[in-house]
């Protein structure tokens, strides 16, 4: 029974990361639209779709109770901060995909686990073991040396990594179930998204006359929610270190799409930075597996 649940966990989690990795192909279908327009529609339609999901899961009451609880314990600010951070992350990713920065976007999600560890040290007083300390140092050195030697700072990668890392940090303060969390986050930011579309006059997207653009924008909400729901189902069946290993599926797919589908240049500065990050991730993953085995032996 346990083996069957673990197998399900691997499948759900792997599929969620594959979907995230393939996202660039989807955003490219909407590249005629400004990134802010795509973001606004993504927020709105994600909220609409998640409301439908909560209705069928019969979790409306739970969602309302969670919102009231957040109001009482002061968690609304953390929820709003999380919604701002995930919106920044979505915007930067969409912009990066449609402006030829796919390789940097993939680098951002390779860096993310290391950034999350760094944020844990700074804000949660977590401690690193020696291997993790070396891993974070190698990654930081790679970015810094690349900046000085090649004059190339991976702004997109750093924005994606830190916005998502800070998003994860803010979510630790709310501890909401994933479906309810996404619903409330999009609910919090939706007035801004609606206001932007109304005041910019971009409610009607370019090419919407055929209906194809509207369909793609609506499905952006569906495809935002689906991998998240699959990930939630998978992650609860797997130990954290296995999820940590599987998460590299998404940036690897994105990297391959950038290189072989859209033929983005792989410069010497990118090669150096990626090499440092991959070396750091190998050490980091090894330290997680080693820690897991040590904890089992005790």
From Swiss-Prot:
<keyword id="KW-1133">Transmembrane helix</keyword>
<keyword id="KW-0812">Transmembrane</keyword>
<keyword id="KW-0677">Repeat</keyword>
<dbReference type="InterPro" id="IPR000620">
    <property type="entry name" value="EamA_dom"/>
</dbReference>
<protein>
    <recommendedName>
        <fullName>Uncharacterized transporter YojE</fullName>
    </recommendedName>
</protein>
<feature type="domain" description="EamA 2">
    <location>
        <begin position="162"/>
        <end position="286"/>
    </location>
</feature>
<keyword id="KW-0472">Membrane</keyword>
<keyword id="KW-1003">Cell membrane</keyword>
<feature type="transmembrane region" description="Helical">
    <location>
        <begin position="10"/>
        <end position="30"/>
    </location>
</feature>
<keyword id="KW-0813">Transport</keyword>
<feature type="transmembrane region" description="Helical">
    <location>
        <begin position="36"/>
        <end position="56"/>
    </location>
</feature>
<feature type="transmembrane region" description="Helical">
    <location>
        <begin position="179"/>
        <end position="199"/>
    </location>
</feature>
<feature type="transmembrane region" description="Helical">
    <location>
        <begin position="142"/>
        <end position="162"/>
    </location>
</feature>
<feature type="transmembrane region" description="Helical">
    <location>
        <begin position="271"/>
        <end position="291"/>
    </location>
</feature>
<feature type="domain" description="EamA 1">
    <location>
        <begin position="17"/>
        <end position="148"/>
    </location>
</feature>
<dbReference type="Pfam" id="PF00892">
    <property type="entry name" value="EamA"/>
</dbReference>
<comment type="similarity">
    <text>Belongs to the EamA transporter family.</text>
</comment>
<feature type="transmembrane region" description="Helical">
    <location>
        <begin position="243"/>
        <end position="263"/>
    </location>
</feature>
<feature type="transmembrane region" description="Helical">
    <location>
        <begin position="76"/>
        <end position="96"/>
    </location>
</feature>
<dbReference type="GO" id="GO:0005886">
    <property type="term" value="C:plasma membrane"/>
</dbReference>
<feature type="transmembrane region" description="Helical">
    <location>
        <begin position="212"/>
        <end position="232"/>
    </location>
</feature>
<dbReference type="InterPro" id="IPR004626">
    <property type="entry name" value="RarD"/>
</dbReference>
<feature type="transmembrane region" description="Helical">
    <location>
        <begin position="101"/>
        <end position="121"/>
    </location>
</feature>
């Amino acid at each position: 029974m346990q083996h069957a649940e673990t197998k399900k966990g691997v499948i759900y989690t792997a599929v969620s990361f594959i979907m995230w990795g393939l996202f660039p192909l989807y955003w490219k279908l909407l590249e005629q639209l400004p990134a802010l327009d795509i973001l606004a529609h993504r927020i709105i339609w994600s909220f609409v779709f998640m409301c439908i999901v909560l209705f069928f899961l019969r979790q409306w009451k739970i969602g309302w109770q969670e919102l009231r609880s957040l109001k009482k314990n002061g968690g609304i600010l953390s929820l709003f901060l999380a919604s701002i951070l995930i919106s920044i992350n979505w915007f930067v990713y969409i912009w990066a995909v449609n402006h030829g920065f796919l390789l940097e976007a993939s680098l951002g999600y390779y860096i993310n686990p290391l950034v999350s560890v760094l944020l844990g040290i700074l804000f949660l007083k977590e401690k690193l073991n020696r291997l993790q300390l070396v891993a974070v140092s190698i990654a930081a050195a790679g970015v810094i040396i690349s900046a000085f030697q090649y004059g190339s700072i991976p702004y997109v990668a750093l924005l994606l990594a830190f916005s998502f890392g800070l998003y994860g940090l803010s979510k630790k303060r709310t501890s909401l179930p994933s479906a309810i969390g996404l619903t409330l986050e999009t609910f919090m930011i939706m007035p801004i998204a609606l206001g932007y579309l109304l005041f910019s006059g971009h409610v009607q997207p370019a090419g919407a006359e055929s209906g194809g653009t509207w369909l793609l924008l609506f499905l952006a909400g569906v495809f935002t929610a689906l991998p998240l729901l699959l990930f939630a189902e998978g992650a609860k069946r797997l130990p954290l270190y296995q999820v940590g290993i599987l998460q590299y599926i998404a940036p690897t797919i994105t990297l391959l799409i950038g290189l072989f589908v859209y033929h983005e240049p792989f410069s010497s500065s990118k090669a150096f930075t990626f090499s440092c990050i991959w070396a750091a991730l190998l050490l980091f993953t090894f330290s997680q597996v080693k820690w897991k085995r040590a904890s089992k032996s005790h």
